[in-house]
């Protein structure tokens, strides 16, 4: 059984004071592996709060190099790192903040070639990728391998958030069967907005891992930060969904040897 060191007991003592948290929840965090895709203003900040909360292992996935116009929101980066792979700087910063956790970096985007191995390596995923191609790949793999996924996205002053449990809640394709047009350089972003959503995303993951509070299951949280309005909308599974529906291909391809274990809890 996993134990907490004296250093960890002191480091996390304030959060262990929360109702329904305690050492049991902290041990679940230490035992967990979380995959974070799109380690930018959203994913990088979410990874920061998972790291300081004591998630035992993070897998950070992001291709490409840091750009100067990333610096208004990517809090793990420094100005001297512009032009270099951001995922390595993310690890360096997080490891300096919390040396007790393990961090693995993948300098690549989510692709059809790597998505299954990435998802199988983790207990759950945070979908913070910057395009729907990667998001759809991750969604399909999480459904296939029965791994929970926190889905978070933003544009300008608006954002949305939900938690997906394969076989229990709608998947991303149920929620967004039609994909919006997207321009990687054409969307506006303010660091305080991506940071707000990132904190909520990390909190969803912590709730899911520990079970200390109820996550957003079958609910879509929509956020309008212009008006400071938060609303929740009920979501329903699409039984004919090509990804998670009753006739989805993975249902016929799965075998008894498929690894679907997860340290996450949900109710």
From Swiss-Prot:
A Pfam family that the UniProt record links to this protein: ThiF
GO terms assigned for molecular function: nucleotidyltransferase activity; thiosulfate-cyanide sulfurtransferase activity; ubiquitin-like modifier activating enzyme activity
Any one biological process term the GO annotation gives: nitrogen fixation
Organism: Trichormus variabilis (strain ATCC 29413 / PCC 7937) (Anabaena variabilis)
GO CC term, one of those recorded: cytoplasm
Protein name (database record): Protein HesA, heterocyst
Record family assignment: Belongs to the HesA/MoeB/ThiF family.
Record keywords: Heterocyst, Nitrogen fixation
Record keyword Manganese present: no
